[in-house]
């Protein structure tokens, strides 16, 4: 699966484009990085790719997954996963039930669903935490659980919005490795926005600076 941006730009109503038009190809398992100052439109770009662009903004150009233009599709049809800087888990669900929320619809049997979640928890280093209250997890554990929930939905591409910015240095390094390894192993194209050059270096993919690149 390849993610392609072809002359993509976002313009507010009555205004000028937030950033120069972007053309970029992200290969399977590759993490491309978008950098730039606050307010330039990094998160708005991700909203546009995911199909969540706010009213009052216009998208130009095209967004393609495996050569198919997904720009006209609603968010649920795009199957683009999102990972945010705040690892949001539903407080009324256990850790395991949070992950089960992300399972693809074709997986219906209770035993099959439970096994898939337990396997995901194991890969995330969260064995035995199925019934745990998510409020008791550490920041790193919450982030890993949130990523596994996203991956259980089998996204065709992944968007990362400052996913490591609220973690301390040690946790940040660990979660970077965990996240990028899963992206590469599953051959998912990913696009990350960040302020941190260390994130871009660890991603080891194309880098777009919205202040200069098009």
Task: Describe the predicted segments one by one.
Residues 96-104, 114:
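Short helical segment in ABC ATPase nucleotide-binding domains corresponding to the A-loop/adjacent helical element
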Residues 147:
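Hydrophobic anchor residue at the start of the ABC signature
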Residues 133-137, 141:
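Conserved ABC ATPase signature
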Residues 152-156:
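A short, proline-enriched helix->beta-strand linker immediately N-terminal to the Walker B motif
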Residues 158-162:
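Catalytic Walker B motif of ABC-type/P-loop ATPase nucleotide-binding domains
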Residues 68-84, 105, 110:
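ABC ATPase NBD coupling module
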